[in-house]
Amino acid sequence: MLKGERVELRPIKENDLKNFLKWFNDMEVTRYLISYLPMTEASEKKWIEETTAKREPVFVIETRNKKGHATAIGACGLHRVNHKDGNAEMGITIGEKIFWGQGFGFETLTLLIDYGFNFLNLHKISSGSYEPNKGSIKLHQKLGFVQEGKRKEHAFSNGQYLDLIEFGLLREEWKK
């Protein structure tokens, strides 16, 4: 488990299925994710089983209230970890909308990036954001990511083609 000031990142468990179905079937939550709705219970259960079997560094994001009760608010992870080349792709979804815009994404990704560089010994973490998602783009910039490219009209979502902004962060840039 990774602990920050307001968030904790813990491994995914089978009983997270209910939250995953809720989050990833919510059009507002997934509007900048390229996913195919609806997500079924079977498909999400299979994904959880495969992810845990591969021991991928994918976590549920939790926050605790003043009484210490934990609430799951989203998920994050490092995907396609390549130990040979020292790189991975980062992703995050804050599924509980009442927690949007309060800095939970920044704190979560700070923990995840530290984990990637200091525990997994990565050299580089990559990420992408679809251009309409201004909040995600600002978050990447605040974390020190550098825009490395743009894939024009990379995905089709909600009746329009979206450009994908590609970001990268090297370990030595993170240490600064």
Language-model features and meaning:
Residues 1-12, 16-17, 58, 65-176:
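Acyl-donor (CoA/ACP) binding surface of acyl/acetyltransferases
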Residues 20-21, 29, 44, 90:
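Hydrophobic pocket/interface hotspot
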Residues 23, 47-48, 100, 174:
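Tryptophan-centered motif/residue detector
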Residues 28-49:
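Conserved GNAT-fold acetyl-CoA-binding loop/helix
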Residues 48-62:
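A short helix-loop-beta-strand connector motif used in the catalytic cores of GNAT acetyltransferases and
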